[in-house]
């Protein structure tokens, strides 16, 4: 039914969700309730499909190559609908960037599967965090893994240039400066990202 409706539409916007909470962990990174199958069917029927994700963390996107756009809205609150609509209709530039890494598969994670169930006393288990400080994007960088979307990733309706990068070290403090300029035709905000590493590579996860 969704596929037939999508085929008869000019474009389709699919809202997909994933519920997480302090006392409710997700069993895996797939969208629940067969939402991946729904998105796949809709995108197959209409290539002009956009997906809005309302999730609490990273999810897998097996349908990514078949859709025209993906907007990660997280849990946007009571005014989320208005904000999402303004972004989708181009009234405001999507200037945000990912604060986490979206893996291409669960196998890229340092611990894809946890054996046991912490909610059941007889199935509780200990976890040895052998990855140390190499968590999040630092794990992917350390292992040379290419994620689906890296930490700091974000698209925009405009473009930006960065010039005049300079670094100055004095009194134990590093100061970095450069100029960022909006070179496109749409008003927007650019997020400057600077990554530093030990020149001797002594730390277990090199960039931060």
Residue ranges and their predicted role:
Residues 1-208:
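C-terminal non-catalytic regions of proteins with extracellular/luminal or membrane-system context
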């Amino acid at each position: 039914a969704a596929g037939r409706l999508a085929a008869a539409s000019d474009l389709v916007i699919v809202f997909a969700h994933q519920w997480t909470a302090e006392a409710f962990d997700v069993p895996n990174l797939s969208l629940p309730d067969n939402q991946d199958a729904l998105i796949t069917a809709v995108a197959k029927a209409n290539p002009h499909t956009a997906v809005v994700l309302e999730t609490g963390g990273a999810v897998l996107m097996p349908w990514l190559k078949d859709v025209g756009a993906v907007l990660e809205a997280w849990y946007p609150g009571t005014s989320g609908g208005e904000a999402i609509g303004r972004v989708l209709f181009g009234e405001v530039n999507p200037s945000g960037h990912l604060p986490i890494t979206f893996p291409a598969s669960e196998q890229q994670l340092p611990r894809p599967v946890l054996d046991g169930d912490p909610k059941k006393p007889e199935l509780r288990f200990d976890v040895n965090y052998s990855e140390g400080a190499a968590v999040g994007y630092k794990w992917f960088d350390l292992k040379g893994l290419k994620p689906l979307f890296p930490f700091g990733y974000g698209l925009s309706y405009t473009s930006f240039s960065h010039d005049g990068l300079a670094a100055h070290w004095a009194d134990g403090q590093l100061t970095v400066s450069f100029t960022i300029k909006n070179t496109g035709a749409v008003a927007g905000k650019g997020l400057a990202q600077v990554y530093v590493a030990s020149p001797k590579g002594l730390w277990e996860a090199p960039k931060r």
